[in-house]
Amino acid sequence: MRLLPLFLMVTLAASGCGIVESKKIDYKSSNKLPTLEIPPDLVAPTADNRYAIPDTEGSGTATLSTYSAERKAAPSGTPSLLPAQDKARIERAGTQRWLVVQATPQQVWPVIKDFWQENGFIVNLESPETGVIETDWAENRAKIPQDVIRRTLGKVLDGLYSTAERDKFRTRIEAGSGGTEIYLSHRGMMEVYATEGKDKTVWQPRPADPELEAEMLRRLMLRFGVEENRAQTLLTAKQTPDQARVIRDAGGSLLEMDEGFDRAWRRVGLALDRVGFAVEDRDRSKGTYFVRYIDPDADNASKRDEGMFAKLAFWRSKKDQASPQLQIVVDEAGEGKSRVRVAGGEGRAADAATQNRIINLLHKELK
């Protein structure tokens, strides 16, 4: 009889085998997912129900196919969320890849927000002014090692175990001449021991993961109707040659890109996301991004010494500590080229050390 409890535990664990292992990505945020809403600054009020949340019979998610099917019964004078004939494709330059969808930003916005929620993230920031949707920090539960004990306990206390990594994603939406361009960037943190005695841990940034970004782009392509085989083919296309170089002089550094202004402007925006800058505002007519550096300690500070379960509520949003505002300026240089320079908060010249540091960071992303 003493073997019965053990037998039941093994049976329960076996029944869950393959659930987590079959997923390379299984994110979970610590808070309840908010209701899907359309940013009021993007969509003008209308009397019809074109932007209503599709009825998914209580599942809490909305798919493009369900949305389209439900809207066929209620035609409108303007297109629904994404017309069936529209396609999505991948474009790339240097090490960067982005998605181009034949739809307006107003149509794309709710699909992207719902996409992140369906993948286990909380949408922490929505900025229609800058076209940014950013998730909260979340852990990839698929990285938790699985054994009999952990699988069994996980059925009762899912949050008992956690990983030493957290991820967040920022999606930037830009209206382009060939459709809406969607740029996706990843930021990561990892927990490391702060003392030799391993009695204290701290969180520190880890490099952006291009493979993780590619996987999320692949999933997003599927959401926009691209077949899986086609999505994988588009992602594995050959990388383009270097298209940017650093130019230095006595006054500092600037970056020269083999791109016209329109494309250079959008690529610089993605690069700023990836290297850890918060874009507070932008003025495309002047080619200027107004940015602040995101302090990882302020963005990801944990509660200290609150017991074993404090970790379960670790990722809580906090306002970034104030840092000097900078201007990243993109100038048309003629002959299909653009130049990127760094200025101070009021347009004055930034010091040479700041210029060199930021230009080098951008070069790694834009070359």
Curated annotation (Swiss-Prot):
Q: Name one GO biological process term.
A: Gram-negative-bacterium-type cell outer membrane assembly
Kindly name one Pfam family recorded for this protein. Lipoprotein_18
As given in the record, the signal peptide range reads 1-16
Q: Where is the lipid attached (S-diacylglycerol cysteine)?
A: 17
Q: Indicate how the chain sits in the lipid bilayer.
A: Lipid-anchor
Q: What is its main location?
A: membrane
| One GO cellular component, as annotated | cell outer membrane
**Which protein family is named in the record?**
Belongs to the BamC family.
Subunit comment for this entry? Answer: Part of the Bam complex.
Tell me what this protein is called: Outer membrane protein assembly factor BamC
> What organism is the protein native to?
Thiobacillus denitrificans (strain ATCC 25259 / T1)
Report the gene name. Answer: bamC
